[in-house]
Amino acid sequence: EQANVLDLYSGTGSFGLECVSRQATEVVFIEKEKKAIKILEKNIEKLKIKKETKIFSGDVFYIIKKNDKTFFDWRPDMKFDLIFCDPPFNDTNINDLIELIITRDLLKKKGIIILHRHKNTKEKLTIYFKVIDKKIYGLSKIIFGKLLPSSP
């Protein structure tokens, strides 16, 4: 409740839309697939939650790393309580994504990052990410974590 949520690789937005239904203050979606964005836009319209949501169309790294004007001008000091990261299962740069979140200072001090990975993914997560819980659902592994205070 009352959370600012960033949904990276949001697809059709099921996670972020669920957050709005649970009283999130604002959900920001970043997705590059045009078909997924069209479905997301229709869902937002049907649910009448346009004022609680914002969609950015494009590559996550481009939008955040390149200091995309539309993203950072929209809410210059925006920090998120919850960041959901659902990159394609074959995407191996999850640590780059975590480090980008750190570099851009997107997570609030007590914020949580949720990673959605394939259950068989064996990756060594950056030392700046502390796993606080893991769940397996079918082929999915959900990892809940926090950034350590010593993050660069």
Language-model features: locations:
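Class I S-adenosyl-L-methionine-dependent methyltransferase catalytic core
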Residues: 1-152
